[in-house]
Amino acid sequence: MTDRRKPSAHPARGTSGAPTPKRRLHLVILVRSFGFPHGMANTNRVRLLGRALAQRDVEVTVLCSRVSEKPGSVRNTRVRGVADGISFRYTAGTTVRPDSFIWRRIREARGYVGTLLALAHLKAASKLDCVYLWSGAMSWQVGPWLLVRYLNTLRVPVIVELNERPWAPPAWPRVIAKRLSFLDGVSGVVAISSWLAEWAAGEARRLGRQVSILNLPIVVDVAESAPSDGPHADQTLVYAASPGYDAALAFILTAMQEVWRRHPECKLIVTGGDRAPSRVPADSTRDDPGPSDERVIRVGYVDRDSLLHLFAQASALLIPLFDDDRSRARFPSKIGEYLAAARPVVTTRVGEIERFLQDGETAYVANPGAAAEYAHKIIEVLDDPAAATAVGRAGLTVAMSTFHYSLYGAKLRKFVESLSESRQ
């Protein structure tokens, strides 16, 4: 979960001395499938990018077109407000999902119409320079597609967030496939990885469209973390699981068989996720330890302060990626939070990892899919805590110099401004 904190500048560089552009921009960040200001990775990225823009004299408004909360586990209670200098509003009139199927459809319709009216009102008031749309790229959806058409009629440039592998359209006639493309009607793309930036460039060429592309990696507020000092006596590994990524946990459990042979007291803490994996892959040498082995501790979802504390106290932080397009496209935000905790990160050589991290220097990096090699990287950490601490500290330096959110405020503002001026 994210929480609202006092905005921080980069701990090493700051932003107070930077010149502020004169023209005030107005940006709407439109989200559909997650809440604000509290939530998970997407919420945190919206919060940090919005904060970076607010520090650059951009008036940012977040419109949530759908409810985000389930009854009994409500994190976002306010329908409108201000968080970190970012205005937000739930256009459905509530944050909580109704129990009734009919009322859910009514709330969804109200949120959609409310979004259209809010955008029209902002446009009429000359307070809508650009819309930054977060609609998800893994499947085609009629709602976002129609929304882009609507914004085109208002002559408002649309930026789309691209942080996952896009869907592949069926083998339909070219004219239909072009109209259903993720980029149809879009002016700009913010891509979280170079793989996605290259995909967007290729898709724009296929469509014959002029689409501006900004490769903006994961962002983190390094001031949120409180790194601990020195090596840790307790051997504790932490894996922050994401929904839909059971294979990663199964891979880790396979690797832990080898780790436990050398370090039988080592514990694995798993946060978040969907559920325990149904099985450990076939190359495991023992039964699935997930539900029964006391060394595997599943804590579920925890509040953000507790999560960051777990990161800071861990012997190592785990995040394996796989040799497939899904992993090559994504760049998990938790990597930035791991690095900011100044604890050693154990990952695999896929996608953006090779761009930003060096094995044995700023992280421990194994080849993808090799559970035994991944286990040996974990063992390296546990065998030499002092060296692992040095690697963790070097990783923090990477987070500060490369991923701190305020580093990207000027670049993102310039991107928004250029698209806005192109429509004037």
Predicted regions and their residues:
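A short, active-site helix/loop in glycosyltransferases that binds the activated sugar's phosphate group
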Residues: 168, 182-211, 222, 279-283
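Acidic donor-binding loop of glycosyltransferase active sites
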Residues: 311-328, 343
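Membrane-proximal helix-turn-helix segments that form the acceptor-binding/catalytic region
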Residues: 47-51, 113-120, 142, 146-154, ...
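A short, well-ordered alpha-helix in the C-terminal region of glycosyltransferases
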Residues: 380, 387-402
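Conserved donor-binding/catalytic core segment of Leloir-type glycosyltransferases
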Residues: 28, 190, 220, 228-257, ...
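Conserved acidic donor-binding segment of nucleotide-sugar-dependent glycosyltransferases
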Residues: 359-371, 380-386
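Short hydrophobic beta-strand element within catalytic cores of glycosyltransferases
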Residues: 319, 337-347, 364
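Nucleotide-activated donor-binding/catalytic signature segment of Leloir-type glycosyltransferases, i.e.
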Residues: 272, 280-309
